[in-house]
Amino acid sequence: RGERRTGPRTRVEIVTAGLLLRRLQADPDLPGVTAVVLDEVHERSLESDLLLALLLDARTLREDLVILAMSATADLDRLPAMLGSTGSTSPTSSGGPSGAAPAPVVSVAGALHPVEEVWAPPPRTSRLGPRGVPREVLAHVAATVRRALAERTGDVLSFLPGAREVDDVVSRLRASLPPDTDVLPLHGRLGASAQDAALAPSPPGRRRVVVATNVAESSLTVPGVRVVVDATLARRPRLDVARGMSGLVTVGASRSEGVQRAGRAGREGPGAVYRCCSPTDWARSPLAPT
């Protein structure tokens, strides 16, 4: 966070959506940039939607600007039309300009091993309370991690909605797991060395539990993980109309987020996902983040 390492020989620069937005506001035609790669475009937010709109405007100023959108769960009906070559400037119902040829779709096949679903809803407790995630739910997530360690082999990756919940579950697990099991947090508030430690492989003879926010949902691969414990919760920006301010609220995760999280367990071999909700809650979840 806050680090920048670029120089005269830089060819590829990795930035956040917010930083690229500020750059577009200062230089709408992105001078010196040949291509922009948007990773995980399915993770929609006000910031990412605005970024995509400004990039499409930039392409009207520079026809040579290449925009590449990547995702394992992208909407292949709307996105190619939106990114298609410019014809007329009037939009169609799919979001792209009328008369435009849709952008080409490149599919990259990846090896994904089967992932078994295990339902582990919290007993007699709602996943969300009036003040966020109840402590009983956090205790249940920690108990589910201990259950997964007893029933499965390999390392465990657990998903919580925010840094506070991550730190709470990490404390519970460190106090209850044997000394040969490392428990590591992973979220955006950590320094680079702590994040690197969470992403490093386990030493021989040791097991590891990584408790993370959605930072590990899709963009990162945590080596050695064969089990995912998903609290099935997420943080969303919401606008408070009465106050005219936006803030983060905790909600149930969407099914597309759940699929992405479960996929972390099937990267290196057959795995399992323990979902801390009931099948009914899962079926009622939105298909994509809203």
Question: What name fits each language-model region?
Answer:
Residues R1-T290:
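P-loop NTPase motor module signature
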